Regions:
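Juxtamembrane intracellular "pre-TM" segments in multi-pass secondary transporters
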Residues: 2-6, 188-219
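Extracytoplasmic
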Residues: 12-46, 67, 232-238, 358-362
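Extracytoplasmic gate region of multi-pass secondary transporters
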Residues: 31-32, 213-270, 358-363
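Helix-breaking motifs and short loop linkers at transmembrane-helix boundaries and internal kinks
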Residues: 43, 75, 96-102, 113, ...
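Conserved MFS/SLC helix-loop-helix module at the cytosolic interface between two early adjacent transmembrane helices
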Residues: 62-101
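Paired small-residue
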Residues: 86, 90, 101-109, 309-316
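Cytoplasmic helix-loop-helix junction between adjacent transmembrane helices
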Residues: 106-144
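Helix-loop-helix hairpin linking two adjacent transmembrane segments in secondary transporters
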Residues: 140-187
Length: 405
């Protein structure tokens, strides 16, 4: 396969998809800052807030399997542009809602609408760039998401001082429509290898992925680590800081900004150096496993000593989270380019099942323990220790499957 690599292609391909993923990540993490405002204005408890926030992940995850087939059949440009229109409508519904049901519907439409932003980028990169550049490209596109996470922290908190959350949501709806138009009219297209392939043939490809031992080596890690980090970053980190560290909204927003900045640094590291590391014979899987081991250590310290160096531990956890996304490249490299969309969305399904289940589950466990008489501090610690236990089990499975080959 010939891979053109002109500067014009880079600008026309990367920048539109990067803008989409920027918005996707901003939407994903915005509730960490907006959540307390919603809880106060609409009298939402932790359980309701967790459900509201996790509807994004539920809709996002449910879209992944059909999304993989759509990407492989119709291409990333058409699929992402169309879905972003749905995301814009969801932001508008969210902005105009006064009850939990309407807010949840809006978040679900947003989740469905941005469900292709990362996977469409991966598919486009697989079509236009050679395999040895995929890890670096993953780093660059994740850096765009890191910028979105940064925007959803202190800048969003400052914006709430000048405009209501409803006005901000309507502004995001307009920005999302603009990005959809840019992708539709600017991003290049390439004839899909799967065009004309029947639904049963496409499903056979999905079956091959889910039957692969290589895929299941990484699937539990995606659920507990990448999904778990999303659940924590998107909502429960801010609640932990408020309940166990006694931080106010401004301090939490600043901490989240540092955490997002650390994530961005990790993404940029992969963007700059991943291809060079591969050329030097350094296995990305070793970097991935090392980062996840460090993440377990950091979360253990946070759970055990919540008031010890949180300003350092949380940003370091952000760096580890950024490196967890290497798993997408590690999974996809075992499958041909024609299956790249389905391979990445198969893993992403597990990731977002984890994000939804764990985000809602943490809220449900905290609420149940508090109802049973536990203090808020003890309930949150128990929920985070449960997450830590799942991550340790996933690591154990990973090492066991590596030994078996």
């Amino acid at each position: 396969m010939i891979y053109p690599a002109t500067r014009g292609l880079w600008l026309r391909l990367f920048l539109p998809f990067a803008a989409g993923y920027f918005l996707s990540y901003l939407y994903r993490t915005a509730n960490a800052v907006i959540g307390p405002v919603l809880a106060h204005e609409l009298s939402l408890g932790d359980n309701a807030l967790g459900l509201l926030t996790s509807t994004y992940f539920l809709a996002f995850g449910a879209a992944q399997l059909p999304l993989g087939m759509l990407l492989d059949r119709f291409g990333p440009r058409r699929v992402e542009a169309a879905l972003l229109v749905i995301a814009a409508s969801g932001a508008a519904v969210f902005a105009l809602s006064d009850a939990l049901g309407g807010l949840a519907l809006g978040r679900a439409l947003i989740g469905l609408g941005v469900s292709a932003c990362l996977m469409a980028s991966f598919k486009a990169f697989a079509q236009w760039f050679p395999p040895e550049r995929q890890a670096s490209l993953t780093g660059w596109i994740m850096a765009a998401g890191g910028l979105g996470a940064l925007a959803a922290a202190k800048p969003l908190e400052l914006a709430l001082g000048f405009a209501s959350w409803r006005t901000i949501a309507l502004g995001l709806a307009a920005a999302t429509l603009a990005v959809a138009a840019i992708i539709w009219f600017v991003a290049p297209d390439k004839e899909s290898e799967e065009k004309g392939t029947g639904i049963f043939a496409q499903l056979a490809g999905v079956k091959a992925i889910y039957s692969s031992r290589h895929f299941w080596r990484y699937a539990p890690m995606g659920f507990w680590f990448t999904g778990g980090f999303m659940a924590v970053q998107g909502l429960w980190a801010s609640r932990w800081m408020a309940v166990l560290e006694g931080m106010d909204g401004a301090a939490i927003a600043l901490r989240l900004t540092w955490m997002s900045g650390a994530m961005l640094a990790g993404f940029l590291f992969m963007g700059f150096f991943a291809t060079a590391l591969v050329h030097r014979g350094i296995k990305l899987e070793k970097i991935y496993l090392g980062a996840m081991l460090v993440a377990v250590g950091l979360l253990s310290l946070i759970c055990t000593l919540p008031n010890f160096a949180g300003g350092l531990l949380w940003p370091l956890l952000g760096i580890c989270f950024s490196l967890s996304n290497v798993s997408y490249s590690l999974v996809a490299q075992a499958f041909p380019p024609a299956l790249s969309g389905r391979a990445n969305t198969a893993l992403n399904l597990l990731v977002f099942a984890g994000a939804f289940g764990l985000q809602w589950g943490i809220g449900g466990l905290v609420g149940a323990l508090q109802a049973a008489g536990w203090t808020s501090d003890a309930a949150f610690r128990a929920a985070f220790v449960t997450l830590l236990g799942g991550q340790l089990l996933a690591l154990g499975w990973m090492f066991l499957s590596r030994r078996r080959g």
